[in-house]
A protein has these predicted regions:
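N-terminal positive-inside, membrane-proximal cytosolic segments immediately preceding the first
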Residues: 1-7
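Glycine-rich, small/hydroxylated-residue low-complexity segments
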Residues: 8-310
């Protein structure tokens, strides 16, 4: 076989491979663009409010990039509302179950406006494991630009991250006292000289909105918020808690937790900003009860609790 023929064979093979990859990229890219458009349409058909601008495909040849302009998604009663100037979804042809998301100009409202956060830049990753286990990570990308619009007394956040896990596998039967958790989470926030870490899970039916009917259904069907660990560190204070929470008939927090603190004087001073009247002489380890619209530590009232929905 002559060298010229060998060269032609190699070149022809490379050209065919390149054409095949181009065809594959555009097939996967256009299919993904259609799936994103269809998903937004399904959200709208399900009763959510969805508005958006252009949906564009780019990224050839290395990545698949979907850009969505001016995306505004909220539940019907706006219990959850997210507005972004631009959201970008990034993946590759060979990793269809793993997406990286970058979002700019984010306005986020949670729990009927109980928490309203503005974040200039967010990044997230979406990965499906074994076909039915979803893991989502959202973080501030190290940028200290988070602003909590509703006053809370909290210092400005320098960085934060939220890890969510959901198992879509069907439950054959319930085992033990508690139902399988429908959502696992871990939240971490850094405010310079203070850190907050919150890990736990939620069981019961999923909340489709922050409304009386949805919360009542979640409560009546055994909904439970499990606090595996809540840890707050600032200066000489390290405050920890773990427990379980649900709602009473008037939609007020109901449950109990174990509390421990290294410095109750500092804890009493800082928590007074949130309306908690804690004794600076509390035991190093104590208990918290939430019942009948009251928060009690060792039987002493420290705060009144209102409903979680107006």
């Amino acid at each position: 076989m002559s060298p010229i023929f060998k060269l032609r064979t190699v070149v022809t093979t490379l050209v065919l491979l390149a054409l095949g990859y181009v065809a594959l990229w555009y097939t996967v890219g256009f299919r993904t663009q259609k799936e994103v458009t269809a998903t937004l349409a399904q959200w709208l058909d399900s009763g959510m409010q969805v508005r958006h601008g252009d949906i564009r495909l780019s990224g050839f040849p290395y990545r698949i990039v979907i850009e969505i302009e001016n995306l505004d998604v909220s539940t019907r009663a706006r219990g959850l509302a997210v507005e972004t100037d631009q959201i970008t979804l990034i993946s590759h042809v060979w990793t269809p179950d793993h997406w990286v998301v970058q979002s700019a100009g984010n306005d986020i409202s949670l729990a009927d406006g109980a928490i309203v956060l503005f974040e200039e830049f967010l990044q997230a990753s979406y990965r499906m494991h074994d076909g039915d286990k979803l893991v989502v990570k959202i973080d501030s990308a190290g940028a200290a630009d988070a602003r909590i619009r509703r006053p809370t007394g909290l210092p400005p956040l320098t960085q934060w991250s939220l890890l969510l896990g959901k198992d879509f596998a069907e439950v054959v039967e319930n085992a033990g006292l508690y139902e399988k958790r429908t959502l696992e989470f871990r939240f971490f926030a850094d405010a310079g000289d203070s850190t907050l870490e919150f890990t736990g899970g939620v069981s019961g039916p999923g909340l489709r909105d922050w409304t009386v009917s949805e919360l009542a259904n979640w409560r009546d069907e055994g909904g439970l918020l499990a606090v595996d660990e809540l840890s707050w560190s600032t200066g000489s204070l390290q405050l920890k808690a773990d427990g379980d929470l649900t709602l009473d008939e008037n939609y007020r927090p109901l449950g109990s937790a174990n509390l421990s603190a290294t410095d109750w004087q500092t804890a009493a001073r800082l928590l007074s900003q949130f309306g908690l009247r804690i004794s600076p002489n509390s035991s190093a380890e104590t208990s918290l009860m939430l019942q009948s619209g009251l928060a009690l530590i060792d039987g002493a009232e420290v705060a009144e609790l209102g409903p979680v929905i107006r």
